[in-house]
Amino acid sequence: MPIQNSPYKAFATLLNSGGHKVSPAELHGLLLGRSCAGAGFDNEGWFADASMLLETEPQDNIRAALVGLQEMVKGELTGDDMTVVLLLPGDDEPLTERAAALGQWCQGFLAGFGLAIGDKVLGSEAKAVLEDLAAIAQVQDALEESEDGETDYMEVMEYMRVAPLLLFTEFNEPAEPQPKPSLH
């Protein structure tokens, strides 16, 4: 039985209720891109970039959702296991819809990364990752509803779970290790 209200659908409904035409995937990509480029996790900078994509100042309920999304991303990028979960339609949705959302995610990521990177020098690995994301954003309509299309999509998804981590590691200062409390 498919999930009736996936996180993606719930966020899309919230954005639509506020009159915002942006997809949750593009918004999540924007956040992850700016975070990976070293923008940090302050709410005001995130709200400013999100407002630009939303084209208006977000209402309180959407601001609260944006804070929650940022906290989730911060936990994923700075946690011990460093795992990224992309905000995309579920596997029960048509491949064309999932591929389109993946392309939107890549567009958002590239925009967020570009906004935050400033004059930092990109290494060859970072350039290659960004070129890959730009290519993925362009082929969003090329995947067909077929077993091969599903396989291609899953391979791209595996790459997408790792690519942001490579960029985050390159452009963010490692967290200071917290001293463990001593037992006396």
Curated annotation (Swiss-Prot):
Gene3D superfamilies: YgfB uncharacterised protein family UPF0149, PF03695. NCBIfam families: PRK02166.1 (NF002562). This is UPF0149 protein PSPTO_5224. It comes from Pseudomonas syringae pv. tomato (strain ATCC BAA-871 / DC3000). Belongs to the UPF0149 family. It comes from the Bacteria. Coiled coil: none annotated. One of its GO terms (cellular component) is cytosol. Pfam families: UPF0149. HAMAP family: UPF0149 (MF_00346).
